[in-house]
Amino acid sequence: MRLKAILICVIFSLTVLPITPANAQVTPAVNLECESLDPSGAVEIEVYPGADLIGIAYCTVSNPNSYQEKIDIQVTADGLVTAHPGSITLGPNAEEEFTVTVKADERMTMSGRNLRVTATVTEVNGAPPPNIAESEVSMIVSILQFSGLQVEAVEASLTLESEFEQDVEFKVYNQGNWADQFSVGLTKDSLQELEYAGFSISIPLVKIEIESMAAPAKALIVLKTPKVSEDWPINSDGQHEKTFTLEFIATSEFSCRSEGYCNSETAYT
């Protein structure tokens, strides 16, 4: 009878021992997704003078486990300034959206930069995690090209004899943030006025490629003056003389192709 009692106690004590199922063990994990709303899929930043210089990545971090996690957020962007939350605490099976803001400098050279967002579990229910759990997303930050130009006449005015050929020189500056091609010539009104008066006009180069912020390129307008007309006014020396305005124009081809308008500048001689 005593032996039976001992056996019963042993069997009973075995049945009440706690058994921890394998799937209840604490194994931290984190999921991270990021995207850009820009059409290219990259985080695009406009850097033309007056732009806000900001690009944004939209991210979602989630805790796939049945316990609370504290998650640190780290961001690198190839030297660009970023703003983002330092850490996020998520309850069981919870998720949270956040933004990563990237700021560029005005007039920065067109380029692509690497953006890396990393989410790392640093606490599990208030305690250090037993393993390293992190999720990382890599994206591209695209510093967008913008157009800019300046033109100037080398000679503000010229006095020419009749039936004389003259090179009229202008300087074209590329003030955009990448190499650009510029079409050069005379405005339509100026060309019509000069041709109607009998000028012959030729342009050796109608397109010029210039590196960003490089030395100015030289553009030439070759004029051959007409014969003197008896209809022209007579000056103080008793000679027929008439003043014409030559209106030079340069246009960024990148702007016409990509910016929705043609960025042009004019200069006069």
What does each model-identified segment do?
Residues 1-25, 59, 170:
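Secretory targeting signatures
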Residues 22-269:
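Long beta-sheet-rich domains in secretory-pathway and surface-associated proteins
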